Amino acid sequence: MLFLKEEKIIDKENVIGSNIRRIRLEKGIGQTELIRDLQLRKIAITRETLVKIEGGRQHIKLDQLKAIKDI
């Protein structure tokens, strides 16, 4: 893992994205529900962004990762 100035985390092996998906599914939380909870916490994220993060096509921001951890 490597941190950039913009507080995005580079995850070349998509460990973070795949773990977010796995844990989300284990908890029975849908993407829409997770996005709603994050937006209520003032985290700027869309369902499209979550799909890209889980699929390894977009880097996650540090504030997004911290908020997901708390759900």
Give the label of every model feature segment:
Residues 20, 31, 47, 62-65:
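Helix-turn-helix DNA-binding elements, focusing on the entry/boundary residues of the two helices
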